[in-house]
Amino acid sequence: VRRVAHSHGIEVSFSPKIVVGQAGSGMHFHTRLMKDGVNQFSEGAGLTDVARRVVGGYLSHAASLTAFGNPVPTSFLRLVPHQEAPTAICWGDRNRSVLVRVPLGWQNLDDRMFRDANPQEGPVGELPNDSQTVELRSPDGAANIHLLLAGLTVAARIGLSDPAMLDYATARYVSGDASKHEGLDQLPSSCAAAARCLLDQRADYEAQGVFPPGLIDAWAEQLFALEDENLREELAADRVLVEDLVARYFHIG
């Protein structure tokens, strides 16, 4: 992408934020669970309990997952209210204000749409339900994709194995604007805060040898070294600092 853009005299950035006050750029992850070629997230209309458990796992580890999915200071300039990015830890159907979104899936549909568009063709029967996913909306282009996917797998496994995760997800379902719902936990506001969340849940990530302890230590140390604990407050009073920060993380991903 960068090479083609350069050939046209254009610069490409995958940075999560290049203009403060405007929506940033995310890298959303759509996931589903397949078993024997069948999507376990959808059965007829609505999500299955399996899907809801996985959502619970994602939500319960959402804060620590930002350590892998949002690993630069400008990541947290994107994760602010009212700029098309999630801040509250919640989920909902076709709701662009939540952290985990259930996009429109082809649930419980027959072939009527096909027949309307192709009236001369014969019936094709029921459509498959394997398109249904759930979408994690917090990550951005700076994400370490390998660590993030491993972390999502850990969170999904916990969602499926912990009996409390179904109720956990149910309690965090939101319809409408998530920013208007009080009492919801919030995503971290800095790399340093994300690192603390990762260390708090390190036992989950290290279980079954998925993440080596040394990797967790090194990754948290790298995040702390960015020294962005109070960055939002500092940027509010210093426009030059904002421009310098955007320039520093313009070419990432």
Which residues does each predicted region cover?
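Active-site capping/gating regions of soluble enzymes
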Residues: R2-A164
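Acidic, glycine-enriched catalytic cores built around paired aspartates
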Residues: T170-G253
